[in-house]
A protein has these predicted regions:
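Core dinuclear metal-dependent hydrolase active-site scaffold
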Residues: 19-94, 109, 174-180
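Active-site metal-binding motif and surrounding structural segment of the metallo-beta-lactamase
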Residues: 1-18, 94-100
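Short loop/turn motifs at secondary-structure junctions
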Residues: 11, 30, 95, 121-122
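A short acidic, amphipathic alpha-helical/loop segment
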Residues: 9-10, 89-92, 111-119
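Active-site neighborhood of phospho(di)ester-bond hydrolases with catalytic His/Asp-centered motifs
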Residues: 1, 79-84, 99-104, 125-132, ...
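Short, acidic/turn-prone active-site loops that include or flank metal/cofactor-
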Residues: 2-3, 20-23, 36, 103-107, ...
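Active-site glycine- and acidic-residue-rich loops that bind
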Residues: 14, 101-111
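Binuclear metal-ion centers of metallo-dependent hydrolases, dominated by the metallo-beta-lactamase
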Residues: 16-23, 93, 118-180
Length: 180
């Protein structure tokens, strides 16, 4: 409901509330919301009220429920995991062509990278996400990450390759296309 409240406050007229498990179609796209968990950051669960004022500061957002999304288009599927945690039974048996996987705070979840690879049947392409300076305005500045973050991204790729050696891991750069 929090996302719906922010969307409506932002002027989005047509909002569909989902809870996970639905199958939706939007023209050539299919979208399946998948129930999930937020990273183990210790952030309290809260709801964003319907009377929220936008734009919001980053610290005004709350964890009000987490979903992941399986998107289909033109015979291909992409799984978007936007936070470093998941419900394994919800992912078991999914076989996406591409998995977009959050890397931030994954170290708090036991065997995070390999458990995802096993649950998804070792997808051929993994894109890292949730590693940039996401509190900065959208643009090139978001990719100004430090040496520690770069080393963590290399470690993520090594984790994936340790249990899924054929998987290609890409660290995306904003506004650069990636062939899938």
């Amino acid at each position: 409901k929090s996302t719906v409240n922010v969307a409506r406050a932002s002027g989005v007229a047509n909002v569909v509330l989902v809870r996970g498990g639905e199958s939706l179609a939007f023209g050539p796209f299919s979208v399946k919301p998948i129930r999930a968990l937020h990273s183990l950051s210790g952030q309290a669960t809260a709801n964003i009220p319907a009377d929220v004022t936008v734009p919001m500061t980053a610290d005004a957002f709350a964890e009000g429920g987490t979903l992941q999304y399986l998107i289909g288009v033109e015979g291909r599927t992409i799984l978007f995991i936007g936070t470093a945690n998941f419900i394994e039974s919800e992912l078991d048996g999914l076989r996406p062509d591409v998995a977009i996987i959050a890397v931030g705070l994954r170290e708090k979840v036991p065997d995070y990278s390999c458990r995802i690879m096993r649950a998804l049947g070792q997808p051929r392409l993994v894109l890292a996400n949730h590693f940039d300076a996401h509190r900065k305005p959208l643009g090139p500045e978001q990719m100004n990450i430090g040496d520690e973050s770069r080393a963590d991204l290399a470690h993520f790729a090594a984790e994936v390759h340790s249990c899924s050696p054929q998987t290609k891991v890409v660290i995306p750069t904003h506004f650069e296309p990636i062939a899938i």
